[in-house]
């Protein structure tokens, strides 16, 4: 289930500390934001640092309709946004609309994900009450954010920039 209050959070932490694998949901914008949310609920940092193995963020995006997506040469701003500087002639795709997709330009959905394993460094940072920004900077040394997964889907032609940014 979802962790919405301190009582549920404490039950989840206690279950984790006694050897149970606990999977739960929290509403946050980033994976590391789950740590901050649990702290804000009142979970003690020393308990949190001992009980977390990893945190994950996910978001649904629409997939471009493969029957009508339109290839185009991205602008310099789009190339910069996607870090496509090493590609000579990059191609991206945009939604158009056809009878197959009810004129929306999209057919289906998929998830984009971010997974952060709580390593010893992050565990110490959580225990010491480090800021979300500091923990995020540390996590980015080893793990890519949800935006990197979105970028991969854009470059593969599965979705468009607008969909990942919305």
Where are these predicted regions, by residue range?
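Short, flexible helix-loop junctions that flank or precede catalytic/ligand sites
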Residues: 1-166
């Amino acid at each position: 289930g979802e962790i919405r209050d301190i009582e549920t959070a404490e039950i989840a932490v206690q279950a984790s500390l006694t050897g149970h694998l606990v999977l739960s949901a929290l509403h946050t914008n980033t994976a590391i934001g789950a740590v901050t949310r649990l702290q804000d609920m009142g979970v003690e940092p020393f308990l949190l640092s001992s009980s977390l193995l990893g945190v994950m963020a996910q978001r649904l995006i629409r997939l471009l309709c493969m029957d009508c997506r339109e290839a185009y040469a991205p602008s310099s701003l789009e190339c910069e946004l996607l870090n496509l500087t090493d590609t000579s002639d990059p191609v991206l795709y945009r939604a158009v609309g056809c009878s197959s997709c009810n004129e929306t330009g999209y057919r289906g959905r998929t998830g984009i994900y971010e997974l952060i394993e709580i390593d010893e460094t992050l565990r110490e940072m959580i225990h010491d009450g480090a800021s979300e920004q500091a923990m995020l900077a540390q996590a980015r040394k080893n793990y890519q954010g949800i935006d990197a997964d979105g970028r991969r889907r854009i470059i593969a032609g599965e979705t468009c920039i607008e969909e990942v940014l919305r």
